[in-house]
């Protein structure tokens, strides 16, 4: 949909090229009264599309039957207002976007009410919005949102729109049919693996079974000799086979002769890591949580003293192994690279980082790189990583040297999805508690050892500050403990 008005703090010129009013990056209203709400977050089965759309529709006073929900693109207008990033993770979507969606809906509602009042030449205070229409109380007249959207979009945007009282909610907190159920049941929902484009080719990767191993040699001529194989070449993490079907690409990638070098990870054993983590529980070095806790400050020496003096003591150890995310939809993406632009379709949890990667790989300006977020067939944090998108764009870039503008879809096999997962780290956690005779918790000391996600993702933490993903809620503000 083209045309529109971005919600901002001052009036702006409406850009209407097809009579659809774009009130913001989140909201469009068509002349027929269809209310199109773009969810900024990736939908991977958790229901966030309906949740965020309901919040906006509630303030807009929309009839839920008139609402349709659009999948997002990588758009700076949709970034997380607190972290200033466009991502879906940590169960934070409603917390982060609730106020934004409320303001978007409330501002558009007041603009629609004002447009109706102007048409009827009455005061806006005499009108109210209800079920996708604006009504004039005294005369009983009403106009649907579709008839008012275009004139409303040229009005000044309210600085502080009135928000509804939760007591007046009709949608939020109420059970309504999920908008994504019919397309999923009928097979019309487009997941990353479903993307089909005219003239599309299909790619597979051959990778070493050992992490960080590189290609020494491979039989490219044998791969190209297979009927239906279009190209074969090395990429950063293996060999790409481009063919006329995914199945053919998979088979050729599996069958070609490849020699890998020796990887740094060869010889790695889970039991050795487990012993190292157990040993680290008693090491002298200790990183602390990097945020202040309410209540008594964290004091290691005082906590250990309180433990030793407590009438009763308890200790427990938990261990978890490396764990694959095992999303139902294997990793996949589709990309097409032109001389002046690139376009990608991906089931990703991090649209902004993917868009940055597209620009870096193709050398194109970021504004010439488009990323469409599809439905995700599960994510669980694995599709937070961008490796599969980077691989796809790299293949599309190489393909464009000979076949510019040819789309290509990369699909990992199920085996690769498990073997080359970005595994949830193995960890060992030990907690020691001091308890009073009447069962009150007097002291709590916890230590966690294991690989750091922050270090893996190259997020620099100050020396001595613990990775919050490792500690999680092990130490939290929810319970008051005198010494911890």
Identify what each model region corresponds to.
Residues 1-484:
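Structural alpha/beta core scaffold segments of enzyme domains
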């Amino acid at each position: 949909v083209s045309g529109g008005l971005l919600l901002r703090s001052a009036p702006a010129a409406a850009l209407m090229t097809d009579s659809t009013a774009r009130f913001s990056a989140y909201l469009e209203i068509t002349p027929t009264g269809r209310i199109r709400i773009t969810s900024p977050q990736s939908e991977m089965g958790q229901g966030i599309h309906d949740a965020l759309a309901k919040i906006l529709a509630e303030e807009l006073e929309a009839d839920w039957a008139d609402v349709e929900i659009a999948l997002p693109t990588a758009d700076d207008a949709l970034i997380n207002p607190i972290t200033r990033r466009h991502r879906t993770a940590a169960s934070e979507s409603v917390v982060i976007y609730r106020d934004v969606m409320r303001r978007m809906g409330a501002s558009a509602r007041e603009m629609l009410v004002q447009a109706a009042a102007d048409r009827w030449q009455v005061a806006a205070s005499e009108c109210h919005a209800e079920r996708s229409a604006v009504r004039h109380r005294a005369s009983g007249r009403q106009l649907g949102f579709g008839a008012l959207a275009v004139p409303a979009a040229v009005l000044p945007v309210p600085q502080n729109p009135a928000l509804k009282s939760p007591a007046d909610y009709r949608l939020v907190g109420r059970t309504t049919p999920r908008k994504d159920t019919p397309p999923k049941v009928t097979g019309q929902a487009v997941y990353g693996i479903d993307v089909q484009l005219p003239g599309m080719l299909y790619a597979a990767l051959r990778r070493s079974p050992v992490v960080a191993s590189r290609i020494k040699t491979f039989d490219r001529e044998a791969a190209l000799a297979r009927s239906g194989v279009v190209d074969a070449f090395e990429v950063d993490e293996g060999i790409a086979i481009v063919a006329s079907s995914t199945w053919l690409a998979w088979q050729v990638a599996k069958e070609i002769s490849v020699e890998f070098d020796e990887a740094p990870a060869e010889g790695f054993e889970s039991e050795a890591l487990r012993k190292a983590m157990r040993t680290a529980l008693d090491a002298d070095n200790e990183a602390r949580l990097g945020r202040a806790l309410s209540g008594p400050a964290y004091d290691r020496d005082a906590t250990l003293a309180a433990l030793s003096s407590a009438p009763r003591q308890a200790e427990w150890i938990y261990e978890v192994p490396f764990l694959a995310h095992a999303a139902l939809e294997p990793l996949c993406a589709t990309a097409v690279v032109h001389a002046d632009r690139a376009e990608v379709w991906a089931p990703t949890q991090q649209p902004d980082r993917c868009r940055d990667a597209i620009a870096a790989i193709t050398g194109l300006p970021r504004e010439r790189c488009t990323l469409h977020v599809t439905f995700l067939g599960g994510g669980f944090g694995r599709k937070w990583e961008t490796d599969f998108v980077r691989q796809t764009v790299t293949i599309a870039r190489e393909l464009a040297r000979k076949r510019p503008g040819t789309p290509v879809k990369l699909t990992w096999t199920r085996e690769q999805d498990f073997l080359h997962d970005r595994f949830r780290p193995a960890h060992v956690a030990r907690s020691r508690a001091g308890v009073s005779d009447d069962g009150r918790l007097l002291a709590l000391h916890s230590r966690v050892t294991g690989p750091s996600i922050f270090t893996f993702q190259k997020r620099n933490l100050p020396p001595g500050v613990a990775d919050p993903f490792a500690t999680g809620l092990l130490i939290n503000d929810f319970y008051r403990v005198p010494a911890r």
